[in-house]
């Protein structure tokens, strides 16, 4: 099974790390690094809503974990000058749970629902009129004497976040006036995030040190900040406290995070496909059995970054590794993937 404290997991970790994440989280769009299209659009929408003195349209934010969906929700509330109340889909088990939140909102407030794709159908039904008409339908009594009453709600903004937009029902998705997708970050933006976080934490970091951490952060700010904290530990114990490129490289190698941001679980998945299934195609269930992992763990945790980086492909016949995987491990490339090239273990993937 995947370790709950996996260093390069994009899922929120221990409470201590979550507290530090909150401390370094930007509060304004001006401080929000990366996602230029999303930032520009949200700045426009927020400015327009403020000018009309209206609540911002309901907003759906989706993308892989750790890219800043919660951060963006908090920024929206901050920029609109309103309060934010946060919850998650699994927590809202009954309509009464949702009603209690909605009836305590002030005009313009933001209700943030993480993992909104996990709302139960009965709760989702209550949410529809609340989103569309700012009304809450409540059943009073039981049996033949039961009756429905409508409560007016102040205009509010629902911000929903999900890693699996495809699991949202069409009626719920259609009620969001603003839909934003967050993409993996490039190394330059991640290096800026690392440098900013280091400054907030009072750390001395060289640009090359920030770039080394960013390079191995899998395009994810949450992972970049987690790696920064572990490199800080290494620098304080085995260095002079400053984070240089050499210190970052030594620390991350010690932590078993390679130059591509892969850890032992990523390498195990790739090598299992190469050694046991001849590079694929292999069905997801067979792969899960070979790795002793759950199917959804492979699909949601391990695969996205490997696919995004071009090491794995999904095909109608199953998963296959690409030539990049063979090059990464210094293995012969099968003829079906191109010329039979043998790479030395210490030769980089670009041949240098």
From Swiss-Prot:
Localization of this protein: Cytoplasm
Listed GO biological process terms: cellular response to chromate; cellular response to selenite ion; DNA recombination; DNA repair
Residues involved in DNA binding: 295, 314, 319
Residues holding ATP: 24-25, 66, 69-71, 132-134, 175, 222
Region (Small ATPAse domain (RuvB-S)): 186-256
PANTHER family: HOLLIDAY JUNCTION BRANCH MIGRATION COMPLEX SUBUNIT RUVB, PTHR42848
HAMAP family associated with the record: DNA_HJ_migration_RuvB (MF_00016)
Family under the similarity heading: Belongs to the RuvB family.
Name of this chain's protein: Holliday junction branch migration complex subunit RuvB
Organism of this sequence: Pseudomonas aeruginosa (strain ATCC 15692 / DSM 22644 / CIP 104116 / JCM 14847 / LMG 12228 / 1C / PRS 101 / PAO1)
Recorded name of the encoding gene: ruvB
């Amino acid at each position: 099974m995947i370790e709950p404290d996996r260093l390069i997991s994009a899922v929120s970790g221990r409470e201590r790390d979550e507290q530090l994440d909150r401390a370094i989280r930007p509060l304004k769009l001006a401080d929000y690094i990366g996602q230029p299209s999303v930032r520009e659009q949200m700045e426009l929408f927020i400015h327009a809503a403020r000018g009309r003195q209206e609540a911002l349209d309901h907003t759906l934010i989706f993308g892989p974990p750790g890219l800043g969906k919660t951060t963006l929700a908090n920024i929206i509330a901050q920029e609109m000058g309103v309060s934010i109340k946060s919850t998650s889909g699994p927590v809202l088990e009954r309509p009464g749970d949702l009603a209690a939140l909605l009836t305590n909102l002030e005009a313009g407030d933001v209700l943030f629902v993480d993992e909104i794709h996990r709302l139960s159908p009965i709760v989702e039904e209550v949410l529809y009129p609340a989103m569309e008409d700012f009304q809450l339908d409540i059943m009073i009594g039981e049996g033949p004497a039961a009756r429905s009453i409508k409560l007016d709600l102040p205009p509010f903004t629902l911000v929903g976040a999900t890693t699996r937009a495809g699991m949202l029902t069409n009626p719920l998705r259609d009620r969001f006036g603003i839909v934003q997708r967050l993409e993996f970050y490039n190394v330059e933006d991640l290096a800026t995030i690392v440098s900013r976080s280091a400054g907030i934490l009072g750390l001395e970091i060289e640009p090359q040190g920030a770039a080394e951490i960013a390079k191995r952060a899998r395009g994810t700010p949450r992972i970049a900040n987690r790696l920064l904290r572990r490199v800080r530990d290494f620098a304080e114990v085995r260095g002079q406290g400053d984070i240089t490129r050499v210190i970052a490289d030594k620390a991350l190698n010690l932590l078993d995070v390679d130059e591509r941001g892969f850890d032992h679980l990523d390498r195990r998945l790739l090598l299992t496909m190469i050694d046991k299934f001849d590079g694929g195609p292999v069905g997801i269930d067979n792969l899960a059995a070979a790795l002793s992992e759950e199917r959804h763990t492979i699909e949601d945790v391990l695969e996205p970054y490997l696919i995004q980086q071009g090491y794995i492909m999904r095909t109608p016949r199953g998963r296959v590794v690409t030539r990049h995987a063979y090059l990464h491990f210094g293995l012969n490339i099968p003829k079906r993937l191109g010329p039979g090239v043998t790479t030395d273990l210490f030769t980089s993937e670009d041949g240098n």
